[in-house]
Structures are given as structure tokens and as C-alpha cells.
A protein has these predicted regions:
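Active-site/catalytic core of tyrosine-dependent DNA strand-transfer enzymes
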Residues: 120, 189-247
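Catalytic-site neighborhood detector that most strongly recognizes the C-terminal catalytic loop/helix
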Residues: 114, 171-176, 277-302
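Basic, Lys/Arg- and aromatic-enriched nucleic-acid-binding interface segment
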Residues: 98-108, 113-151, 155
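Short, polar N-cap/turn motifs at the start of nucleic acid-interacting alpha helices
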Residues: 161-166, 247-249, 268-287
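Short, charged phosphate-coordinating catalytic segments
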Residues: 83-92, 143-166
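Conserved tyrosine-mediated DNA breakage-rejoining catalytic core shared by Y-recombinases
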Residues: 156-197
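N-terminal core-binding DNA-recognition domain of tyrosine recombinases/integrases
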Residues: 11-24, 33-111, 126
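Short, basic (Lys/Arg/His-rich) helix/loop patches that form interaction surfaces
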Residues: 232-275
Length: 309
């Protein structure tokens, strides 16, 4: 155990994740290890990971086109690995490189991911005569209207999740970690009912999946692979819609940000938006709304020389 290196430490953690069927987290750690080894080589001694090493690693990743969001994910995984090594007596606490006055993990900046209502109208009304585009456009619309539901949750919704005209679900992302998982409630709008009737499975029993993509036999890793496949297909179609409508960026992820930002622009309280998204705290929601805050600053700055007021 004393000779444990980064590769073996990650593999130990990944085995636990695999045994617990935490597929998404497993794949996230796998990606982090691959990226760390692309900089530092294989079998990196834990003691080699210093503040300077982390700074050089960050610069290396940025030069390769990695985003700060990705860097943050990789380093959070590494931080957990090193914390575990300290707890197990493998690494001295004084060697821990993260924290105040050491290396601080960068936060993903608030990128403009949300669409305006005008752009959302373009998406919802877009037609090119093909069922292929129509299906994945409708999936995006459903995600947007259903509180920005993540595709991991959307594809595995069952008819039992429909209660009194609402879709009620717990986010798979937080169901394992949160002590008291928050149930999200999304009113089913007429547009959502139309999408269910158009693309959904007929209701056989409460456990019937609303949509046709899953069959219930998938294990944890197959579920993740299924979601990634559908998301990839959806994003390809969304890219075509964006190109043909003049929308700068349209992906499955923009549905969630658009839901939050449209409500904020309409005057909804951040606490309500946070609850609707199923966030654990307001700080997470505020990060979603970071670009909205920039828009506010731009408008307010323009007021300073608006002599027509």
C-alpha cells in the first residue's frame, strides 16, 4: 500500500464505483486518470503531485483545448483520491496540494448556454419535413419544458412518474449522494402531452417507460452508454437546427440552462429555480445564471449614458 501510485489509487476507487454500479462516476474517474496520465505519464507517484505540478498540468490541458469545466472535474476526482490516500496513511497530510494558499481548483465560468425565448420559439417551430429531426427536436423541447430534465432521467421516466398532471422524479445524479433527495415536480404542458402521444410508448402498466429508448433490461453501464448514444444523436440533429435557424449554440445541455434563464428573465426567484432544477444549494443555481448576471451588468452599464430616460 505504501508504494501506491496514482494509477493504482484510481483503479482501487474505480473498482469500488464499478461494484456499486456508479457508472457515470466510474467513467468520470476513468477520464480523469487518462487526462492526468497524458500529462504526467503512467504510474505517477502520489508525492510527485505538488502545487507546481498541478499548475503545469492545468497549463498543459489548456494548451490542448480543455475547458475549465473539464479541468475542474478532473482535479476534483484527483482531490478525492489524495484525500483517501491521506486517510489510509499512504500520503502525508503536509503533501496535500489542494486548498487555500495552495492550488485552488478553477471553477467553470458562466458560458452563454441559455437561449432567448425568440430562439426557443425557432426550435419549437422548426420543421424540415424529416421525422428524424422532428423526433430529436421534440426530445429537446420536452427536456426544456420538464424543468430542464437531464437525458439520464428523461429516457428512464416511467408512467408511475406521472402524478396529478405532473412529472415527479428524483435526479439520478443526486439520488445516491443527497441525504434527503429532492423530488422535482414539473407540470405537464399540452406540448409535453403531444410529445408523449407522438413518440412515447402506450401505457401498459405504471412501470412502462414513457419513451421508447430503454427496455428495462439495462445494467448501470448499459444505461450510461444508451444515454450517451441518444445524446450524441440528438446533438447532431440539434446542430443542423442551429445552423438553419442562426442559433449560435444548441445542445441537449442548453435546455437546462434555458429553462433556468428564461424563468429568471421573467422574474422568478432564484430559490424557486433552484428547487425546480433539483439543485442542492443556491450556489449551483447561481453558476447556471452567471451569464444572465452579465447581461444585467451590460444593460445597467448602458443606462449610465442613456440620456433618453
Amino acid at each position: 500500500m505504501k508504494d501506491m501510485n496514482l494509477h493504482s489509487a484510481f483503479n482501487l476507487k474505480m473498482k469500488e464505483l464499478k461494484d456499486n454500479e456508479q457508472a457515470s462516476t466510474y467513467l468520470s474517474y476513468q477520464s480523469a486518470l487518462k487526462s492526468l496520465e497524458s500529462f504526467g505519464g503512467t504510474y505517477i507517484p502520489l508525492e510527485r503531485i505538488t502545487v507546481d505540478w498541478l499548475k503545469r498540468c492545468e497549463r498543459f490541458w489548456l494548451s490542448k483545448g480543455k475547458s475549465y469545466s473539464s479541468i475542474s472535474i478532473y482535479f476534483r476526482a484527483l482531490k478525492c483520491i489524495l484525500n483517501r490516500a491521506i486517510q489510509d496513511g499512504i500520503l502525508k497530510e503536509s503533501s496535500f496540494p489542494f486548498g487555500k494558499n495552495k492550488y485552488e481548483i478553477p471553477e467553470g465560468c458562466g458560458r452563454k448556454l441559455a437561449l432567448t425565448l425568440a430562439d426557443i420559439k425557432k426550435v419549437m417551430s422548426y420543421q424540415d419535413g424529416t421525422k428524424d429531426i422532428e423526433e430529436f427536436r421534440d426530445l429537446w423541447v420536452f427536456s426544456y419544458l420538464c424543468n430542464g430534465i437531464n437525458f439520464m432521467d428523461l429516457l428512464f421516466l416511467q408512467y408511475s412518474n406521472i402524478v396529478d398532471g405532473e412529472i415527479c422524479f428524483v435526479r439520478s445524479k443526486t439520488s445516491r449522494t443527497a441525504k434527503h433527495s429532492k423530488e422535482i415536480h414539473a407540470i405537464i404542458t399540452p406540448e409535453m402531452w403531444n410529445i408523449i402521444h407522438k413518440w412515447g410508448n402506450p401505457r401498459i402498466n405504471p412501470q412502462t417507460y414513457i419513451f421508447k429508448y430503454a427496455d428495462g433490461t439495462e445494467n448501470a453501464f448499459e444505461r450510461v452508454r444508451l444515454v450517451r448514444r441518444i445524446v450524441t444523436k440528438c446533438n447532431r440533429r440539434l446542430k443542423k437546427i442551429a445552423q438553419n435557424t442562426g442559433i449560435s449554440q444548441l445542445t441537449t445541455y442548453t435546455a437546462r440552462h434555458s429553462f433556468a434563464t428564461v424563468l429568471k428573465r421573467a422574474g422568478a426567484k432564484t430559490s424557486y429555480i433552484s428547487e425546480s432544477l433539483g439543485h442542492s444549494n443556491l450556489a449551483v443555481t447561481e453558476n447556471y445564471l452567471a451569464y444572465f448576471e452579465k447581461e444585467e451588468r451590460i444593460r445597467n452599464a448602458q443606462l449610465l449614458t442613456d440620456f433618453n430616460i
